[in-house]
A protein has these predicted regions:
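Catalytic active-site module of serine/aspartate enzymes centered on a nucleophile-bearing elbow/loop
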Residues: 163-198
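Short beta-strand immediately N-terminal to the catalytic nucleophile in serine-hydrolase-like folds
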Residues: 1, 19-21, 46
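Helix-loop "lid/cap" segments that line or gate small-molecule binding pockets
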Residues: 79-93, 100-104, 115-122
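Conserved serine/cysteine hydrolase catalytic core
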Residues: 95, 109-159, 168-170
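Conserved acidic catalytic loop of the alpha/beta-hydrolase fold
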Residues: 1-17
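Flexible "cap/lid" loop of the alpha/beta hydrolase fold
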Residues: 30, 34, 40-72
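Core-facing hydrophobic residues within beta-strands of well-ordered domains
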Residues: 40, 161-164
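Gly/Ala-rich beta-loop-alpha elbow adjacent to hydrolase catalytic centers
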Residues: 21, 25, 29
Length: 198
């Protein structure tokens, strides 16, 4: 995915943008910074299961550890995704938003998207070797109460990335929604000069 991002940045003539890549975007952004550092000015990452060994919970752990993609295909995608998004888009409180999240994984898209996280057991050890060499300034923002991607993933990044700072938020997995004001404020501060602190 990092290679794809580098090509996209080149094709769209974006220069060296500030990358905001929470959740699964964390690994992609880090691979981009490791392999094409000239393509990125800074990173805002966090909430991705990037540790080696993997530290994940709930349905994410089940998907990563499933013996095959066929097993993932048998999982009830609507239930799994519905449970994950309930704290930020409740089926009763925001039915349209909830349905949008859940239906995005219908028609086999849940299993197909699971291919990405199922590569973590192979990719995370490679990423671990690259992290100390990534000099791109990195801001790590995530919810401290994330049941899918425990806080230890963010501490791991802060320990291994030489130019990083970490910001725990009072939120779960969807920190950008659950603590949107603070999340947005941190990003604005970062891209308007804060990244130069690291």
């Amino acid at each position: 995915m990092g290679t794809f991002l580098a090509r996209l940045i080149e094709e769209w003539g974006l220069g060296a943008p500030h990358i905001v890549g929470p959740d699964v975007g964390t690994a992609a952004a880090l691979f981009l910074a490791a392999n094409a550092p000239d393509r990125v000015t800074s990173l805002t990452i966090g909430g991705g299961a990037v540790r080696a060994p993997i530290d994940a919970g709930g349905a994410l752990k089940d998907v990563i550890e499933a013996p095959s993609l066929d097993v993932v295909r048998q999982l009830d995608a609507r239930t799994n995704i519905g449970f994950a998004v309930e704290p930020v888009a409740g089926a009763d409180s925001e039915p349209d938003v909830h349905e949008d999240y859940v239906s995005a994984y219908d028609l086999g898209r849940f299993a197909e998207s699971a291919r990405f996280v199922r590569h973590y057991p192979d990719q995370n050890p490679v990423l671990r070797g690259l992290l100390p060499s990534i000099t791109t300034p990195a801001q790590i923002i995530s919810g401290r109460e994330d049941d899918l991607v425990p806080w230890s993933n963010n501490e791991y990044l802060a320990d291994l990335l030489p130019n990083s700072e970490i910001h725990p938020l009072d939120a779960g997995h969807f920190a950008w929604e659950q603590a949107s004001d603070e999340y947005g404020r941190l990003i604005v501060d970062w891209v308007t000069g804060g990244f130069q602190r690291s």
